[in-house]
Amino acid sequence: MCESALLERLVATTSGYPSWSVLRQAVHKRRPVHLAVMVEPFLSYILDGKKSIESRFSKYAIAPFYQIEPGDLVLLKLTGGPVIGCFTTDSVEFVALNERERERLQRHYSVAICADGAFWEARQDKRYATLVGVRDVQILDPAPVAKSDRRGWVVLQTRRASHETDQLTLL
């Protein structure tokens, strides 16, 4: 299913839930919307306010690397389960990883990421990192998402290009 169809279905599915007004407003205002697929305990850490930075590490420069900005809406989906929360992006940092950068991230962000030694060890072969500051966390009524691919991050709606919003009148 393509990203726009996934977003449309999610908006339709959640139309009766007041807690989901944040998504409807984002879609209406063309605010970028992302879907982050998460495992426990990291999902609960965000919802509980313990985790203040969401991190994504990859071998390739894939989403959300250079595809997210402060103010974007991030929906939180449990792996194999529904979307149950969201947050607004507070800050972002994109890092091309090498040993020095990996050590810097570990030294400065382990607490905010809720990362232990095993976390960092599992990411030794990664070449890119995206750090996303978390603010305005909301718990949402659970909503199923018909997502069957293995991507851990999906950009559902991008920023409207300036040429899409500006019209020239020739009168």
PLM region descriptions:
Residues 1-31, 59-60, 84, 95-171:
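Contiguous surface segments at macromolecular interaction interfaces
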Residues 88-90:
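Conserved positions in beta-strands of structured domains
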Residues 77-82:
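Short, charged beta-turn/beta-strand-edge "cap" motif at the junction between a beta-strand
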Residues 32-39, 86:
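Short amphipathic
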Residues 34-36, 50-59:
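Short, structured beta-strand/loop micro-motifs enriched in basic residues and often containing a Trp
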Residues 46, 65-68:
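Short, well-ordered loop/turn sites that connect or cap secondary structure elements
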